[in-house]
Regions:
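Canonical positions in the second alpha-helix
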Residues: 57-58, 91-92, 125-126, 159, ...
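Register position in tetratricopeptide repeats
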Residues: 44-45, 78-79, 112-113, 145-146, ...
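Residue-level recognition of tetratricopeptide repeat
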Residues: 40, 74, 108, 141-142, ...
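N-terminal leader/linker segments that initiate helical-solenoid repeat arrays
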Residues: 18-71, 252-254
Length: 254
């Protein structure tokens, strides 16, 4: 984790340096500025919190500076400080409405801050602009999470027309364990869950099966399909042995 954090902050430092050299700053950065010296030192040591403090001082002293304000957005995201990240992402996106990275970080922050409706609005806008299948997947997650099921199915139908490459993958949690599968399989699984909750169970089963055709080890889809089969098997038994007819799939992807 420490190596990843250092790598991420070094990447940010290089991005800032390149942007500054290309003349994109609105307030020129001085290499001798004490706040930037602390920032650079913090970056090299992987000390993200100190880097954030240094940049806040620098931006406060120097006024608007596009490069370092954008960097604050990324650093706050790295720290998981979603209130602060949203503040800067929202501020910057008002000045740069076509910056999809800022828009995406706004949506992520809103999701983390338990504001799913607002996050959905952001990801709807983002997906309409980018047609990025990862943005569609996140939108489906959010829509399913607050039971906007018809919208979730509609998003699934739209994104499934796109071309998916084998390198499009995603991670997921099963209890304490983490798995990895194809992004398309994950989309099929959420699509199946939405169909199940809409009482379109035959179609839901087909989507879980489609996910498993892509990845037979995908545990979420496997558990959902097994739960459906168990419910179907129970429906044919004497009434005393029947499970609850409204029982949902065993595993839901939130």
């Amino acid at each position: 984790m420490m190596k990843k954090a250092i790598a991420a902050i070094l990447y940010l430092f290089m991005a800032v340096t390149v942007s500054a050299q290309s003349g994109k700053t609105t307030a020129p950065a001085s290499k001798n500025n004490p706040h930037l010296k602390v920032f650079n030192q913090s970056v090299m040591s992987g000390d993200v919190p100190s880097a954030v403090v240094a940049l806040n001082y620098y931006v406060s002293d120097q006024g608007a500076n596009t490069v370092y304000e954008d960097t604050l957005v990324m650093l706050y995201m790295q720290l998981g400080s979603y209130v602060q990240c949203y503040y800067w992402a929202d501020k910057r996106s008002k000045l740069r409405p076509n910056d999809n990275n800022l828009l995406e970080m706004k949506g992520i922050c809103l999701d983390k801050l338990q504001q799913p409706k607002e996050a959905i609005a952001v990801f709807e806008q983002l997906y309409s602009k980018t047609q990025n299948s990862y943005h569609a997947y996140k939108l489906m997650e959010l829509q399913y999470g607050i039971k906007r099921l018809a919208e979730c199915v509609a998003t699934g139908m739209a994104v499934e027309k796109q071309t998916f490459k084998p390198e499009y993958t995603m991670t997921y949690n099963v209890g304490e364990q983490m798995g990895r599968t194809y992004l398309q399989a994950g989309i099929f699984n959420i699509h199946g869950l939405a169909l199940y909750d809409l009482d379109r169970k035959a179609e839901a089963k087909q989507y879980f099966e489609k996910a498993l055709v892509l990845d037979s080890t995908f545990m979420l889809a496997k558990q959902n399909l097994e739960a459906m089969k168990a419910i179907e098997a129970g429906a044919g038994k004497p009434k005393a042995n029947n499970p609850s007819p409204g029982a949902p799939p065993a595993n839901k992807q939130d």
